[in-house]
From Swiss-Prot:
One of its GO terms (biological process) is isopentenyl diphosphate biosynthetic process. Keywords: Chlorophyll biosynthesis, Isomerase, Isoprene biosynthesis, Magnesium, Metal-binding, Photosynthesis. GO terms for molecular function: isopentenyl-diphosphate delta-isomerase activity; metal ion binding. One of its GO terms (cellular component) is cytoplasm. Mg(2+) binds at H116, H128, E223, E225. This is Isopentenyl-diphosphate Delta-isomerase II. It catalyses: isopentenyl diphosphate = dimethylallyl diphosphate. Binds 1 Mg(2+) ion per subunit.
Length: 309
């Protein structure tokens, strides 16, 4: 048997013995990685001594660096994420975002954590599908929310009614008539604002358009989204979830313009989310006029993806 064959054989036995240890408990993502052929094929030997009765293989420290990278990807950076709110951290790893290309074709999925890491966004060009809900009452006032202080990206900024992403699951992957995104919007309005599903029927959401943008939040986190812009006109009772929302308020067009003035002047520490700012600057007020005239369907353009990065 050649030295290379000996190395491969011993490497396989080493990894199998390692994984069979009853004391070893691995996160599912790590278990998949360590069982994979890529793990075994990346083993590098420092020295090989072959004889008829003896083979000694010393495995390089490459193992630990590969394992460390896998651990960070699967579980996050323990040191820098220590201050993350427990609820937000759980959602970061439980939620699987829908990865798309710039034409909004589904290409895969990944954790909310990875999809919001600027390092991954830049190195892997991760782009995920998202939605922004604009809910108006019968007086044509827009419901705004202030994101909670514990949000990982853009805490305490003012934004539109609800902003999130559809999950990688059957009911939220339906492309026809943006049904998957509308299902996700209904789910998140309950989760963030306590609005029951029956108060915001899926067929009442009007998809007006799509935009693609990228926005860093701080040195570590950010957004890179293909965002569906959904309007709905309903009178609802709001019961904000404090894990998601710090405050809410309804505004008319003049009140929103006054808020924008204060933000631009740096008054009261007010800030807007970057996606809300893009919608305000490019679409909102002309669409709002359609809301008041009852001609919202005339403003719909779901064929164009507005690239605003």
């Amino acid at each position: 048997m050649s030295a290379a064959s000996h190395i491969h054989s011993v490497a396989c036995r080493l990894s199998s013995s390692f994984l069979a240890s009853p004391k070893l408990k691995l996160h599912p993502r790590l278990s998949f990685f360590f069982h994979s052929s890529s793990f075994r094929n990346h083993i590098i030997t420092r020295s090989v001594f072959c004889s008829s009765s003896h083979l000694s293989v010393r495995v390089s420290s490459y193992h630990s660096s590969v394992a460390a990278k896998a651990t960070t990807s699967a579980m996050g950076d323990t040191a820098t994420d220590a201050g993350m709110d427990a609820v937000q951290r759980r959602l970061m790893f439980e939620d699987e975002c829908i990865l798309v290309d710039e034409n909004d074709h589904v290409v895969g999925h990944d954790t909310k954590y990875n999809c919001h890491l600027m390092e991954k966004i830049e190195s892997d060009n991760l782009l995920h599908r998202a939605f922004s809900v604009f809910l108006f009452n019968s007086k044509y006032e827009l419901l705004l929310q202030q994101r909670s202080a514990t949000k990982v990206t853009f805490p305490l900024v003012w934004t539109n009614t609800c902003c999130s992403h559809p999950r990688y699951r059957e009911s939220e992957l339906v492309d026809e008539n943006a049904l998957g995104v509308r299902n996700a919007a209904q789910r998140k309005l309950l989760d963030e604002l306590g609005i029951p599903a029956e108060d915001v029927p899926v067929d009442q959401f009007i998809p007006l358009g799509r935009m693609l943008y990228k926005a860093p939040s701080d040195g570590k986190w950010g957004e890179h989204e293909l965002d569906y812009l959904l309007f709905i006109i309903r009178d609802v009772n709001v019961h904000p979830n404090p894990d998601e929302v710090a405050d809410v308020k309804y505004v008319n067009q003049d009140q929103l313009k006054d808020l924008l003035r204060k933000v631009d002047a740096g008054e009261e520490g007010l800030k807007l989310s970057p996606w809300f700012r893009l919608v305000v600057e490019n679409f909102l007020f002309k669409w709002w006029d359609h809301v008041e005239k009852g001609t919202l369907q005339d403003a719909t353009d779901m064929k164009t993806i507005h690239k605003l990065t």
